[in-house]
């Protein structure tokens, strides 16, 4: 596997409470770790993958540093308690960008995701900038060519930019073009969008692509009226679901460690209300958490918030 590296055992360290009781375990004690990329040979049905890349953020004129996200998030996860579902996780290593070669990294991630999915594993990818979503989403599309895949993005931004080259602002336009090329529907829902952070051109493109959008104000005003029906529609209409969480959807007070912190945002407690029914639906095939930038974290606050999201997803995933 090109651009792939196994995760060092040193990243999975934590407090050992096993002297108290046999089940006093933490994630670092229950996660399996692949020494080579062979998902069909590994136990568990949740493949944890890193995408150490922020070349897309650089191209999008953002604050770089998210390439260090996978390592920081693994460290944050390692010491969390291991409960139901967590022993299904296997660390399948990290795809790392080589210099500015984003397109090659995209292809490597795409192939790694498709291989994991075909081996019967759902994928939980730790980014990396939001360019992660193109490689991840394309891998899911490749693994399920005859099925309807719904894409749900929790994000302050639509990420449908027109640009000469791929970036962290283009992944869903790229996925739309990929769906066009494969002659399949592009089914995209974006929840938590800030109207103040997206130009009219992006809203026009969303309308042209028939994107279902729920703005941040609507999420905060009435969850049951604006959000729940969209979740229920996605679960009912599509065969598989791909959930991508841009951590800049969170308020800056909860998530300072991103390229573009949100002035308003959707709080973590509400994000968990969105995530739970998707995890329990039996249709959620893939999840990623992107844009975490440890360079801008404050006392590990952002890492803990992101890790709690990932922890909860693995716990609820059915």
UniProtKB/Swiss-Prot annotation:
Residues that, per the record, bind Mn(2+) 1: 130, 155, 159, 246
Free-text cofactor note: Binds 2 manganese ions per subunit.
UniProt cross-references to CDD domains, sorted A to Z: Formimidoylglutamase
InterPro entries for this protein: HutG, Ureohydrolase, Ureohydrolase_dom_sf, Ureohydrolase_Mn_BS
Residues noted as binding Mn(2+) 2 in the record, renumbered to the chain: 155, 157, 246, 248
Required cofactor(s): Mn(2+)
Keyword Manganese found: yes
Keywords in alphabetical order: Histidine metabolism, Hydrolase, Manganese, Metal-binding
E.C. code: 3.5.3.8
GO MF annotation terms: agmatinase activity; formimidoylglutamase activity; manganese ion binding
Pfam annotation, one family: Arginase
Keyword flag Manganese: yes
Pathway in which this enzyme or protein is active: Amino-acid degradation; L-histidine degradation into L-glutamate; L-glutamate from N-formimidoyl-L-glutamate (hydrolase route): step 1/1
Listed SUPFAM superfamilies: Arginase/deacetylase
Catalytic activity: N-formimidoyl-L-glutamate + H2O = formamide + L-glutamate
GO biological process, one term: L-histidine catabolic process to glutamate and formate
Family from the record: Belongs to the arginase family.
Cited PANTHER family: ARGINASE/AGMATINASE (PTHR11358), FORMIMIDOYLGLUTAMASE (PTHR11358:SF35)
Stated role: Catalyzes the conversion of N-formimidoyl-L-glutamate to L-glutamate and formamide.
Protein name: Formimidoylglutamase
Source species: Klebsiella pneumoniae (strain 342)
């Amino acid at each position: 596997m090109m651009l792939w590296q196994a995760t060092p055992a040193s990243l999975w360290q934590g407090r050992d409470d096993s002297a108290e009781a046999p089940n006093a375990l933490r994630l670092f004690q229950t996660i399996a770790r692949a020494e080579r990329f062979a998902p069909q040979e590994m136990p568990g049905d949740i493949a944890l993958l890193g995408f150490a890349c922020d070349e897309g953020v650089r191209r999008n004129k953002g604050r770089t540093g998210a390439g260090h996200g996978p390592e920081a998030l693994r460290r944050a996860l390692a010491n969390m308690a291991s409960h139901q579902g967590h022993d299904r996780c296997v660390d399948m290593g990290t795809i790392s960008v080589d210099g500015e070669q984003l397109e090659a990294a995209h292809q490597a991630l795409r192939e790694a995701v498709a291989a994991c999915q075909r081996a019967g594993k759902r994928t939980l990818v730790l980014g990396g900038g939001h360019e992660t979503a193109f490689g991840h989403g394309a891998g899911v599309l490749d693994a399920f060519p005859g099925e309807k895949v719904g894409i749900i993005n929790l994000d302050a931004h639509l990420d449908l930019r027109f640009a000469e080259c791929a970036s962290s602002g283009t992944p869903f336009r790229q996925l739309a073009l990929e769906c066009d090329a494969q002659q399949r529907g592009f089914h995209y829902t974006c929840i938590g969008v800030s109207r103040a952070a997206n130009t009219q051109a992006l809203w026009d493109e969303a309308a042209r692509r028939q994107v279902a959008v729920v703005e941040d104000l609507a999420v905060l005003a009435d969850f049951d009226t604006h959000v729940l029906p969209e979740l229920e529609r996605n679960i009912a209409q599509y065969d598989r679901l791909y959930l991508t969480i841009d951590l800049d959807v969170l308020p800056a007070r909860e998530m300072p460690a991103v390229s573009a912190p949100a002035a308003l945002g959707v709080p973590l407690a509400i994000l968990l209300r969105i995530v739970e029914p998707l995890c329990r639906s039996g249709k959620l095939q893939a999840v990623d958490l992107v844009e975490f930038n440890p360079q801008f974290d404050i006392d590990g606050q952002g890492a803990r918030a992101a890790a709690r999201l990932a922890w909860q997803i693995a716990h609820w995933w059915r």
